[in-house]
Amino acid sequence: FKYTTPGSILDKTRELVIETFEKSASEIKDGMDVSLLCIDIQNKKVSWSGANNPLWYIQDNKLIEIKANKQPIGKTDLVQPFTTHDIEYKEDTTFFLFTDGLADQFGGPKGKKFKYKQFQELLISINDKTMQEQSLLIDKEFENWRKDLEQVDDVCVIGIKI
């Protein structure tokens, strides 16, 4: 297709998903949230675009959030082109792509949602660990929070340290 920016890739993906849904005998009102990151290691730059899912990155021990376009890949009332964000990064920057499953998980002492603020605080607190250690600590925190409650959604967290 010759699309090179995350925003244009998400635009084309949305077009293809809608086209596919329209071929169905029944009306499909579904979509997906996506976060797409392209890494240019030589120029220390990333390009990112998101459909409902933000990008978080930790640089100099500060968590920075880049907000996503508030629209899914799929049919939506107001279709706008997806924005591509270009970010220059320093060595030892960690990027996080994730679904809403961890933040939406019920648990803890009061059976409440984990929430994004708590998720951010967790990521900052474990930032000095290796990515493998971070993975284990996130999983442990999730299980300790959830305890015996049912998992409510898929949980996917991708961390990339550059």
Which sequence ranges carry the predicted segments?
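Conserved subregion of the PPM/PP2C metallophosphatase catalytic domain
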Residues: 1-162
